[in-house]
Amino acid sequence: MNIISKIFMKKKFVLACAVLLLCATSFAQKANYALAERFSAKRVNQMVFSTQITPNWFRDSDKFWYSWRTPQGTSYYIVDPVKGTRTEVFDMDRLAMQVTEFVRYPFEAKHLPIRDLRLKDDKEFTFSIISGLNNDRDTTCFRYEIATARLDTVAREKDKYPRWASVAPNGEFGVFAKGSNLWVMDSTSLRKAAKDEKDSTIVEHRLTTDGIRQFGYGYGNYSGDTEADSTKRHYPGELVWSPDSKRFATMKWDVRKLDDLWVINSVSGKRPELETYKYQMPGEPGPKGYLYLFTMNGSRDGASFKEIKSQAFKDQEVSLQGARRTAKDNYLDYWKNEWLGDNTGFYMVRQSRDLKRLDLCRVDVDSDSTKTIISERERTYVEYRTPFLIGGGKQILHWSERNGWANIYLYNGDGTLVRNLTEGAFHVEDILGVNEKEGYILLSACGVNKDENPYQMHTFRVPLTGGALQQLDMNDMDVLSTASDDAKFFVANYSRVDWTPAVALFSATGKRIADLETADLSLLFEAGYKFPERFKVKAADGVTDLYGAMYKPYDFDSTKVYPICDYVYPGPQVEANNISWSKGFTRTDRLAQIGMIVITVGNRGGHPNRSKWYHNYGYGNLRDYGLEDQKYAIQQLGARHPFIDLDRVGIHGHSGGGFMSTAAILKYPDFFKAAVSCAGNHDNSIYNRWWSEQHHGVLEKIDKGDTTFVYSIQTNPEIASNLKGHLMLVHGDIDNNVHPANTIRVVNALIRANKRFDMLILPGQRHGFGDMNEYFFWRMADYYAEWLIGDSERWKPDITQMNND
C-alpha cells in the first residue's frame, strides 16, 4: 500500500470514529428521575386545586352557587346572572371562629373542612364539620342563613329515603328489588328503613312472584342475581316512573344463557377468593329482555302488571328513556327517576344486536301498544342520544348521524319530520337546554369553526324555526358548558391543553356577563411546569388532518436529541389526544420528564366527535386501523424537529391503548423499539360483546328462520412472533372489565415463539390499577429509561422516589 493510500485510509478511520463518537454522545443521556418525581400525582394535587366550576342552580331562580379552591383555601360564591353579581357566601375568617366556638376545637379559614354543603329553600345552607383527632372525632351540623349570616347548630340529617329504593315522583312509596322480585314500601316505612333497616315495624309488600335466579326483576341485561342477593334489598335497574306516580315500567332480563367468567383475588383474605360474574363475549348467545308495565294500586294493595310486546330483533337491546333532571329535582330527598313522556305513554329505544337498526318507540299505557316513531338504519352502527321533548311532548328533538355528521332534527310526535334544526359538516354533541317561550335551543358542537381544532367544543344557539348557528362563547378554546333550566344562561368552563383553565358566565344572547374564575397554576409553574405544544399532521392517506399535543421535558434543550414515546388510545369511543388542560397528566407530561418527547395524536377511526366516516374508519379492522396513522404522524414530527430521534421510538397505552401499543410493536417491529402495554384487550374475541361487536361488526346469519351471530377478528397473539423490540405487559389480576386472559394469551404466544419480554401483574387491582398507579408509573419509567434513554434505575430494589413522596 503506498503512502497516499495509507493517508486516505487513516482519514477514513478518523472520520468513522468521529461519527461513532457523535452517535454515542447523542444517545448518552441521563434519565431525569428527579424531575419526574417532582410532578407525582400527590404533589400535583398539592399544587393545583380547582380547575372547573359545577354550578349548583337555585330551585326557584336563575341564581347558582359554587365553590372554588386555591392554595389560599376554599371560597363559596352565589352568582346572580340577572344582576350580574357574584357574592361571597361566607366570611371565612368569621365562620372559622364561629365554628371553633361551637365545637371547642380550633380551626382557621384556610383549613375549615366544610362537608355536605347543601342549599335549602334558596335561603339557607346546611353543612357539617368533623372536629377532633383519631378516636375523639365528632360531626357537628350547621345551618347558615344567607340573608342574616346567622350560624346555628342543627340535628344531623340522615337520608330520608334509602338509596336502594326507586321512589315515586310524589314521594309516597318506593319500589326495590329483593331476591329476584320487586317489592314496595310506603313513605313511612321507607323513612324508617333509612334510619334502621332492621326496624321491626317496617312493612313491605311483594309486587311480583315469577322472578327466578338469572331471570328476575331489577337486574341489568349483563348481570344477574346471586345467592348472596336473596335477602338483600337493592336498587332496581331500568325502572322509570310516570309523572303522576301511578305507573312504572321496567325490564326483566333472562340471562340464563350467559356464561360466567371468573377472577381470583389472591390477596383479599386468608384464602384466595373466587369472584364470579356474567360476561357475554362476541358471538355468544345474548340475554332476552321483557318489558313490563306496572299500575300501582297503592302501597298496601300491590300492583297489577302486564308485558308490553316490544320484540323486533333477536338479542335486541332495549333502553327505557328517562326524563332530563332539572334543578328542582336536585332539591328532592330522593333521586327522581321519571320516564320520558307523559302520563299516557313513555319512550323506549330498541336496537338490533348488530346495532345497525334502531327504533325510537312510544308505548301507550292504555292500549299497551308500541309504535315506532323514528327509525335509524346504518351499514356500520347507529348511535343515539336521549331525545328532548318539547311542546308538552308534541314534538321531538332528535339527534342523528344519518347524513354522516351528528345533527339535530325536529319531529312531530307522530314521527313526521318537520325540519333539520342543524345541517352541516360538524358534530353536535348534545342539547344543553331549550327555551320554548323564546323559541331557541342551546347546544354543544365542534367542527363548526373550520380554522380551529375540530375537537374544540363550543356553545351555540339555534332557533326552533331553523336557521344558522350562533356561537355564544369564545373562539379557539375547548368549552364545557352547563345551562340553566330555562336556557337563559350558561356557565362556560374553557381551556386548551396549552391554556390555563378559566370560567365565564354567559347569557343565551352571547353576552359575557362575568369572568368568574381562573385556575391558579402558580405553584405548578414555580415547580418548573411548561405547557405542551399543539401540532397538526396528516394521516397516512396524506389528506386527513390529525391533531395532537407534544410534551417536552421541562429542562428541554433544543441542541439535544431525544427519544419519542407515543401515548395512544385508538378509539373508537375516544382518543388519547388531550384537547383541554387537565392536571391528570401522569402518562404524558410527567412521563416526558425522564428525558423523552411524549406525544398524543388522533387517528382515523378514533374520536366520535368528527365525521362518521372518520369515526367508523376502523369498522371491520379493529386491530390495525389506527397503527399506520400513528407511525406516519411520528415520522412527520421527526422530519419537522431535529431534536426527535426516530431510531428510539416507544409507544404506550392502557386498555384499548394497551391493545394498540402491543399491536404497533408487532406490526411495525423495525420502527417501534419499546412498548409498555397496560390492561390491553389483546384478543377482542374474549372482550365484552357490546364493545367488540359494535366497533368491529358482527355477521348476522339467518338460516331456517333462526338468527345466529358470527364474530371474527384479528388478534395480537396471532402476530406475537414478529416481536423484535422490548415489550412490557401489565395487568391487574382481578380486572373484571378486560379479563387478564387477554394478556395471558399474548404471553402464551410470545413464549411459544421463543421471545423475551417483560410482564408485571398488579395483585388485587381492577382495570384502572387503583392504589398501585404510582408503582406502575415508576416501573414504566424504568422501562423507557433503560431501552430508549440508556440510563435506568430498573435494577435497584428500592423505588426511592416513592419512599420520598
Identify the residue ranges that each predicted region occupies:
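Short intrinsically disordered, low-complexity segments
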Residues: 20-22, 40, 644
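Beta-propeller folds
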Residues: 28-501, 505-506, 793-794, 799-801
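Serine-hydrolase catalytic core recognition
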Residues: 55, 260, 334-335, 343, ...
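Glycine-centered structural positions embedded in regular secondary structure
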Residues: 19, 36, 218-220, 510, ...
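Residue-level detector of intrinsically disordered/flexible regions characterized by low predicted structural confidence
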Residues: 4-8, 12-14, 145, 162, ...
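Bacterial Sec-dependent N-terminal signal peptides
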Residues: 1-31
